[in-house]
């Protein structure tokens, strides 16, 4: 199935559309780097587009635009469709968490008169990639009186940045040079340099005390308050065009905020009432298995679908309607996939691997080895998606996650499929996935938006 590079056949007007769409995305991905930040952004934009908190609605009719917020870290947007909801919905589910470092509950320490922030890495990172790179600290802290304090340090013009200092090559021979990549630094040593000025004190750890004093002066945060916090450490810096032609985007967190952005824009841009109820669901915790009360395994999906159906059916509501609505639904697990990286092309089956700039990849299954932990979309659903994309002249390509037994991974697809929802993975291809600088194609981003919008309209 050889295809010509789609860029070649594009008009200048089409190229301008793609580049203009990407500029808005770059601003988004540069500013909103955590799941809380993306949720807040999405809610603000949705309200401007006419979406209303579902808690304020007692009845729902076709055309109503509503949202459900799950503890400020997951959010679902829905447009009630013309058809009976028990006949099925069209869902697109992406995740807004990305691999990162999280501060420990008691994080601040001092070693050799330098103050550090102790961390626990979150998700599948290559630990060595986080050494000697500028870092930003973001999150929330709840003070002892319950007051919520938000932190965002490292990306504003006059902000300091933070760093995990690496060992110099002159002294790394025994401690690092001959180790495997995942042993170059131990997880326990992913400690972030946050201060060096001591204060006058009779106590030890004068630099730590000085750092804590500065934090208290600016944020009212005391050392014990970190126990009730969610502090995330992410790469500092903004999204950049990659290459002389500027056709690629380099940024942190594109897994999976590129899909979150495309699916949000798609549902916001729906001009007519869809036939089926359209749902855009942004979830948390995918990178660690979709666990926790804000992950897809929490059954929040079932909760808000039940609430929608109750507000549609009222006295005629019953649980069977919920089960039918889920069973008859189709969903896109909107998550990125691994593009061929020519430097490491031996891990891919080139005939079944996506390329940057060839359109949105269709991934029938993920998992590892013998399709273990995969949902494996049925041929009927793949046929439906293929026809949908072709009918709307949307560029697409096939994708698998590397050669058989080379490795593997998973998405939220299996959790959606557990409800009986027919599910397929479909999201842009990425080079350097899970790194501080992931690379995507502007063409693929735009075609993801077109694909998601076409799916909602069906």
UniProtKB/Swiss-Prot annotation:
Example of a GO biological process term: proteolysis
Positions bound to Zn(2+): 95, 170, 434
Domain of life the protein comes from: Bacteria
Pfam families membership: Peptidase_M18
Gene3D superfamilies attached to this UniProt entry: Aminopeptidase i, Domain 2 (2.30.250.10), Zn peptidases (3.40.630.10)
Cofactor: Zn(2+)
GO cellular component terms attached to this protein's record: cytoplasm
Alphabetic keyword roster: Aminopeptidase, Hydrolase, Metal-binding, Metalloprotease, Protease, Zinc
SUPFAM superfamilies in the record: Aminopeptidase/glucanase lid domain (SSF101821), Zn-dependent exopeptidases (SSF53187)
Enzyme Commission number, as recorded: 3.4.11.-
GO molecular function: aminopeptidase activity; metallopeptidase activity; zinc ion binding
The protein's enzyme class: hydrolase
HAMAP family named in the record: Aminopeptidase_M18_1
Homology family: Belongs to the peptidase M18 family.
Protein name, as recorded: Probable M18 family aminopeptidase 1
Organism listed in the record: Borrelia garinii subsp. bavariensis (strain ATCC BAA-2496 / DSM 23469 / PBi) (Borreliella bavariensis)
């Amino acid at each position: 199935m050889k295809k010509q590079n789609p860029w070649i056949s594009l008009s200048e007007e089409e190229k301008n559309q793609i580049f203009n769409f990407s500029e808005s995305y770059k601003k988004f991905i540069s500013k909103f780097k955590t799941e809380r930040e993306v949720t807040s952004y999405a809610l603000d934009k949705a309200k401007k587009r006419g979406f209303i908190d579902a808690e304020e609605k007692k009845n729902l009719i076709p055309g109503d635009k509503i949202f459900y917020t799950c503890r400020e870290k997951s959010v679902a947007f829905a447009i009630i469709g013309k058809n009976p909801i028990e006949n099925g919905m069209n869902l697109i589910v992406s995740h807004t968490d990305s691999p990162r470092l999280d501060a420990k509950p008691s994080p601040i320490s001092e070693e050799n008169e330098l103050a550090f922030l102790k961390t626990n890495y979150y998700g599948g990172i290559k630990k060595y990639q986080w050494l000697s790179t500028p870092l930003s600290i973001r999150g929330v802290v709840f003070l002892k009186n319950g007051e919520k304090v938000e932190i965002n340090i490292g990306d504003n013009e006059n902000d300091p940045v933070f760093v995990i200092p690496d060992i110099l090559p002159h002294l790394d021979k025994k401690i690092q040079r001959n180790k495997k990549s995942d042993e170059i630094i131990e997880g326990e040593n992913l400690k972030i340099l946050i201060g060096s000025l001591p204060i006058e004190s009779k106590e030890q750890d004068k630099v730590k005390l000085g750092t804590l004093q500065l934090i208290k002066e600016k944020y009212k945060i005391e050392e014990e308050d970190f126990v009730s916090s969610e502090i995330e450490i992410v790469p500092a810096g903004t999204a950049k065009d990659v290459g002389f032609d500027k056709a690629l985007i380099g940024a942190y967190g594109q897994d999976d905020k590129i899909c979150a952005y495309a699916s949000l824009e798609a549902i916001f841009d729906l001009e007519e009432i869809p036939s089926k109820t359209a749902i855009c669901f942004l979830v948390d915790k995918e990178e660690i298995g979709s666990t926790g009360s804000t992950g897809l395994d929490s059954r929040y999906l079932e909760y808000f679908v039940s609430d929608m159906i109750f507000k549609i059916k009222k006295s005629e509501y019953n649980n069977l309607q919920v089960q039918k609505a889920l069973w008859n639904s189709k969903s896109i697990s909107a998550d990125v996939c691994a593009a061929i990286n020519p430097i490491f092309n031996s891990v891919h089956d080139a005939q079944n691997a996506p390329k940057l700039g060839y359109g949105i990849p269709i991934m029938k299954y993920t998992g590892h080895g013998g399709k273990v932990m995969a949902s494996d979309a049925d041929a009927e659903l793949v046929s439906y998606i293929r026809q949908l994309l072709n009918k709307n002249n949307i560029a697409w390509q096939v994708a698998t996650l590397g050669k058989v037994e080379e490795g593997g991974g998973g998405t939220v697809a299996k959790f959606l499929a557990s409800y009986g929802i027919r599910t397929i993975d479909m999201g842009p291809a990425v080079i350097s996935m899970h790194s501080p600088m992931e690379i995507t194609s502007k063409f693929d981003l735009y075609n993801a938006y077109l694909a998601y919008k076409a799916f909602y309209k069906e």
